[in-house]
Each structure stands twice: as structure tokens, then as C-alpha cells.
Regions:
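Catalytic cores of enzyme domains
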Residues: 73-261
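Non-catalytic, usually N-terminal nucleic-acid engagement modules in DNA/RNA processing proteins
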Residues: 1-83
């Protein structure tokens, strides 16, 4: 099978199994992640970037649980697509593996679970899926910021896509203005501490605080956590695997629109 035919088949497999967009780039075009990719899959030559779209209604809903539910689904769909592509390529004789953008993550030092093996936003831009927005997120032509990403690393030599020549973001700054904690300042800059404390308010740091409260003498603050909303939210995080609590920058992007064909 030719390189082009193999690439087309890999992409169609992704699109048939939950992906809405697929791009390809050579491992050499991700030099920042070269060592990590080699650790994950020695001899990897290509990376496929997979995007699955959100429901726009869910992102903009006043009921946050709809956006959370849809986030779980979007990640599941991208994961299903990635695994389907990896299995297809292995049937063709190429070592291949799906790589998450969300969880599971490497919890060891120095990252401590705060970053994935590959920056899929960066990979998405270089694979021609979109361009950077003022928030630093990937903005696609088709779905704006309303996508979730993951991908595949493979020893197959696939035909790479080219980065877009156009800038998809119109730099309206609505994502920056929508941020409730002023973590976004434009130009792709993101105060990750401010953003993380808000969007992951019931994530690991909250759990760590909860455990510390159990080890220490009970305080009024800890009692409020146990008796109030905090423990219920923490339980839900464990049950669903989702700990996103803010979708403002995604939902306000004017490029995020209904995918009417």
C-alpha cells in the first residue's frame, strides 16, 4: 500500500469511529516532544491529531453539567477514533498507540500530572487543523474552539498535512473578555495557575486539600467541605473522570458555531 493510500485509510478510519477532524504531521515537526515520543514509541515517524467536536448547545447551556457530560463524550469519541486508527495501522504492520490529551497522565516529577506527553494544540496547528486563538487554544475552521483532542503515534510513514496559510482566529478578544478569573490576556497567554484553580476547582489540588484536612485537626473549613457541596463534587469527579468546570472561552468564540452542512 502506498504512503498516500495508507494515510487516507487511517484518516477515514478515524472519521468513521468518532473523529470530526484528522491531521497528520511528521514526528520531526514536533521537536519539542521528540524525546517523549521516542520514549512512548521508539522509532515513531508520524503523529495523527484527532479532534472530536462539542455540542454547541451544551457548551452554552446555563446548566454546567451538560457541558461536562458533553466533554466526557467528546473525549470518549476522540479516544475511540485514536484506538481504532492505532489498531488499523498495527494490522498493516506498524507499531501504533493512542495518546491522550486528558487523563491518564504521568503523575511523576516534574510534571505531576499537569501536562500531557504531547501538546495537541501545537500538534493540531502544525497538522493543519486550525490556528492559535487569543486564549492559546486551537481554533478550527469547522468548529472554532469547540473540540477535544488526542492522537496517535505510529512507526508508519504517513503523508503529512501542511499548516493552514490563513489565520482562523479573528482576534475579537471575546474569549479573553469572557474569562471569569482574568486568566487570559490575549496573544495566546494564559495564566495557568488562575485558569487551573478555576476550571479544575474540584481536581487534584482540592482532593489533596481534602486528604490533608483528614490528617490534621478538623477545621471549620474542612467541615464545610465534608458537609457541603465540595465532597459531592469530588465524588462526582471520581465517578465520571471529568473535572472541568468552566467553558467560557470555548463557548464565546465566534468561530464556534453549529456544524450545518
Amino acid at each position: 500500500m502506498t504512503e498516500l493510500k495508507l494515510t487516507e485509510k487511517a484518516k477515514s478510519t478515524a472519521l468513521e469511529n468518532g473523529a470530526d477532524l484528522v491531521g497528520v504531521l511528521n514526528v520531526k515537526n514536533l521537536p519539542e516532544h521528540g524525546e517523549r515520543i521516542e520514549r512512548m514509541l521508539p522509532g515513531a515517524r508520524s503523529v495523527l491529531v484527532i479532534a472530536s467536536r462539542h455540542s454547541l448547545a451544551s457548551l452554552r447551556s446555563g446548566a454546567n453539567e451538560l457541558a461536562q457530560f458533553d466533554t466526557i463524550q467528546a473525549y470518549n469519541e476522540s479516544a475511540m477514533a485514536a484506538h481504532a486508527v492505532a489498531r488499523y495501522l498495527e494490522y498493516q504492520g506498524f507499531f501504533s498507540a493512542g495518546v491522550p490529551a486528558f487523563i491518564p497522565l504521568d503523575m511523576d516529577e516534574p510534571g505531576k500530572g499537569m501536562r500531557g506527553e504531547i501538546c495537541w494544540r501545537r500538534a493540531g496547528v502544525r497538522a493543519g487543523l486550525g490556528s492559535y486563538g487569543e486564549s492559546g487554544a486551537l481554533v478550527t475552521k469547522e468548529y472554532g474552539q469547540a473540540v477535544r483532542l488526542c492522537g496517535v503515534v505510529t512507526t508508519a510513514g504517513l503523508s503529512p498535512d501542511s499548516p493552514l496559510e490563513e489565520d482562523v482566529c479573528d482576534h475579537c478578544m471575546r474569549c479573553v473578555e469572557a474569562c471569569p478569573v482574568n486568566a487570559l490576556t490575549g496573544g495566546g497567554k494564559n495564566n495557568k495557575k488562575l485558569c487551573g484553580d478555576h476550571i479544575f476547582k474540584f481536581g487534584f489540588r482540592y482532593f489533596q486539600k481534602f486528604i490533608q484536612g483528614m490528617m490534621d485537626e478538623p477545621t471549620d473549613e474542612f467541615r464545610k467541605i465534608v458537609q457541603g457541596n465540595g465532597l459531592r463534587q469530588l465524588w462526582q469527579t471520581f465517578m465520571t473522570g471529568n473535572y472541568y468546570y468552566c467553558f467560557k472561552c470555548q463557548s464565546q468564540c465566534p468561530a464556534t458555531r453549529l456544524p450545518v452542512k
